[in-house]
């Protein structure tokens, strides 16, 4: 089992590394050239900027039983199809039961943008979100260890 982080814009890279270290689980950080994130205790793979270049690199590496951290619903869906456990930076675990509704919500938001309406942005990150993320990741790791 490996934890793969879609690190472009990911606020929980360091928290993930801290938890992974406690469980002895290797971490791979994947990012593009505008977000190079070298961290001790993790392998960092850097890819050219481009539409979904990091996403496709991550999908090509993920294996059944791996854990993926991403906020990208499309990437999450592809990783679920490869039997990975997938969670976002707020501790929401993506599953076969919720991914379709999340993808539909993303589609509806993009439709609104095309009409000139802008959905409300995300509020500032809170400590509670970090706690939820840590709890979810630890539960997954405890289950798989």
Show which residues each predicted segment covers:
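Nuclease catalytic cores that cleave nucleic-acid phosphodiester bonds
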Residues: 2-145
């Amino acid at each position: 089992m490996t934890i793969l982080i879609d690190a472009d814009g990911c606020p929980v890279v360091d928290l993930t590394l801290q938890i992974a270290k406690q469980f002895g689980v290797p971490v791979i950080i994947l990012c593009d050239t505008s977000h190079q994130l070298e961290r001790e205790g993790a392998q960092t793979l850097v890819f050219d900027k481009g539409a979904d270049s990091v996403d496709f690199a991550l999908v090509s590496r993920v294996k059944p039983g791996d854990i993926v951290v991403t906020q990208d619903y499309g990437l999450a869906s592809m990783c679920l199809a490869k039997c990975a456990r997938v969670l976002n930076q707020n501790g929401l675990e993506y599953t076969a039961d919720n991914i379709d509704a999340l993808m539909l919500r993303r589609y509806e938001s993009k439709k609104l943008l095309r009409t000139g309406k802008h959905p409300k942005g995300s509020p500032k990150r809170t400590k509670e979100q970090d706690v939820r993320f840590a709890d979810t990741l630890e539960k997954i790791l405890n289950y798989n260890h």
